[in-house]
């Protein structure tokens, strides 16, 4: 297979236009052979639908620099399981791109990964979308880092789920 040979030996030579033209089958071939070899320009050339064909295992192998090069529309296209391994590397702008499907699938362990600057980047709407059990993952420091508008966004169900220890 010519493409497999190219993916194994000459991946870095492909232009952004060539990357953007890859089919799902070609991306799967690349994923099996060279999961870490995308350049920043190549990652940004991937369409949101192309990104959805990549496995969470592949995405987890990407460096923080590669993850932070993803565009907001690429982040929004990811399935919750694809987004999860990237969460700790997302910039505030990328976090703002998380949609309701992604927010409602966050777990306590996902929340624990967030640094103060990331946590504060979540919009009030995103805070209101968090599952009640995800809030149980917050530590006292994260609670202190909440902005007033984020606290105001908490729903009744979210408040009811909180223990005295959380506050």
Short names for language-model regions:
Residues 1-167:
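General marker for long, soluble alpha-helical cores
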């Amino acid at each position: 297979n010519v493409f497999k040979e190219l993916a194994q030996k000459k991946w870095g030579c492909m232009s952004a236009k060539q990357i953007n033209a890859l089919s799902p089958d070609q991306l799967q071939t690349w994923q099996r052979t060279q999961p870490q070899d995308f350049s920043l320009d190549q990652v940004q050339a991937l369409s949101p639908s192309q990104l959805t064909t990549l496995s969470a295992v592949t995405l987890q192998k990407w460096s923080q620099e590669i993850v932070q090069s993803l565009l907001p529309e690429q982040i929004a296209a990811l399935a919750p399981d694809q987004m999860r391994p990237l969460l700790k590397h997302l910039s505030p702008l990328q976090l703002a791109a998380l949609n309701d499907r992604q927010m409602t699938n966050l777990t306590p362990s996902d929340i624990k990964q967030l640094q103060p600057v990331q946590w504060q980047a979540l919009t009030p709407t995103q805070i209101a979308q968090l599952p009640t059990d995800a809030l149980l993952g917050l530590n006292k420091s994260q609670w202190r880092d909440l902005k007033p508008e984020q606290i105001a966004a908490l729903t009744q169900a979210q408040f009811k789920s909180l223990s005295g220890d959380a506050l």
